[in-house]
Structure formats: structure tokens, C-alpha cells
Amino acid sequence: LLTEPQTPPQLATERYSPKLAKADVQALAQCARQHRTTLATLLSVGWALCLRRLTGNDDVVFALVVSGRDSRIPGIDRAVGSYAGIVPRRVSIDPAASLARLIADAEAASIRQADYETSALNDAIRSLPGNELPFDTLLSITNFPRSNPIGPIQLQDVRVDNHNALPLNIIADIGEEIAFHAYFDQSRLPPETTRGVVDMFADVLRTIAGEADQQVQALAGPALPVLTPLPNPEHPHHAIHRHALRSPDQIALRFGEVVVRYGDLDRRARMLAAELSG
């Protein structure tokens, strides 16, 4: 599914609106009430099940966007500005367990993780071996109230583009229906594959709404190893360092009359890395 990354990435956006109709969302909300959880938790479980099918792994990790608006802070719902952050969400899936058990475990994990929603992602990554991101997909769940306008100001035809270094970002916009937006690097993920992944996500959510008492392996189907890791991908800084050793005087960057050669670029990068990690 994923191919070797290119430089620069070929960013693209696909919009799916809606994929879950009003009746499906109502069934999903009823499931959330029955299991004393939230729609956001059910969507997280659904995305974890998708990743299981795509990777063939029962232990998956993805990036989850959190609001950063702790309900324990008075007046936080009226505060202006973005407090959003990203946390790694790890889901361990027991194929023999019921989906209800998986939902309960996910809700408990969400509660435990609430105290870390304002933590810096970089701090968490620095504690990992090799400072590597433990995920390559991101899920963002938006649930803004639409029935209570504030003041006379109205916004129309608003478009927001979101891009980052991850090859696939899914935004689920919850209203009476659930619309899906996919932001992806099409040099690594073809558009038709992205659509297939989003369709799978919607189908899994419909299944969750109607069959929460069955076993996970019966709901998600057999693991489908479609997503495969890249064969020993080389990081850009390694390539720059290797090139600097071979041709230190070759021009790496040029801006107007300013010229930076590979040897100097490598030296500056190492100094900056030492400063940031120090």
C-alpha cells in the first residue's frame, strides 16, 4: 500500500461527505450509550480495527488529535484559540475477545491518557529508540456544535487544508451525518487506495453499531496484510551526511547570493541536533 517516499511529497486532499448517513450515526450513538462511552472512542476503535486489517497486526498505534480542552478547567469551552495536540493511541486487539470488551478497554485507555493530552509530542518521541514516530496515520475527530450560533457572524465556504509528514490523515466530522476527509501523500498512497481505506472505515463503524456483542475476529474479518513497511528507508539526514563525506564542497543550497555547501550543511545540522537533544 505504501511506497517509497519521494521528495518533495505530492500532497493531495480527498473529501468524502457524507459516508455515514443519519441513521448510521444514530445507531452508532445508541451503541455508545449502551456501552457508556463516546462516539470518539467508537471511531478510535473502528480505526484501530481498520489498521489491524491493513497491517495484519493485532497491536496497532496511530496518532490521535485531542482538543486539549480539559473539561475540569472552568470556562475552557468559551476560550478562544486552538489547544489541540497529538497523542499516540495504542490499541492491543484480542481477536477472541468481544467488541464490547475492546470498546471498554479503549474507553479506559482514553481516561488514563486524558492527563497527558497537553504533553508535547516531541518529548514523547525523544524517549523512544531512534526518536522514531511510532505511527504513520492520524485520526482527527471533530464535533463542533452547530445549533447554537454565537453572535451575528456567519462563515460560509470555509476550506481548511491540513498537511504534515504522515502519509495518511483522516478527519471524521461528526454531525447528524459523519463526513470523512482524507489528507494524504499521493506519491506514497494512490487516491483509489485512500478511498478504499475510508470506505473500509465507514463499513467497520456500521458493523460496530450493529454487532458489538460478537467477537472481534468475526467483525473485522481476517487480517489483510496490505500495508507493508518500507524496505530499510534512508532518512534525509543520513543521505546528506553520506553525500557530505563524498563531496563536501558541492553546493547543497542556494538562496540569492548565499551558498551553503554539503560539508557546511552537515556540520550545521549536527550542531543543531546536538543543541536540541542536549
Language-model regions, residue ranges each:
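Non-catalytic, low-complexity flexible loops and terminal extensions
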Residues: 1-13, 65, 90, 109, ...
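AMP-binding/adenylate-forming domain of the ANL superfamily
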Residues: 11-30, 100, 104, 159-179, ...
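His-Asp-centered acyl/peptidyl-transfer active-site segments
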Residues: 14, 31-44, 53-157, 186-190
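Short amphipathic alpha-helical face segments that pack within enzyme cores
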Residues: 38-50, 196, 200, 271
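Histidine-centered acyl-transfer/condensation active-site motif
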Residues: 39, 172-191
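Adenylate-forming
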Residues: 43, 139, 194, 240-243, ...
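Active-site catalytic microenvironments for nucleophilic, acid-base chemistry
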Residues: 49-54, 90, 204-207, 275
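Short amphipathic C-terminal alpha-helix that caps PH/PH-like domains
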Residues: 103-110, 195-208
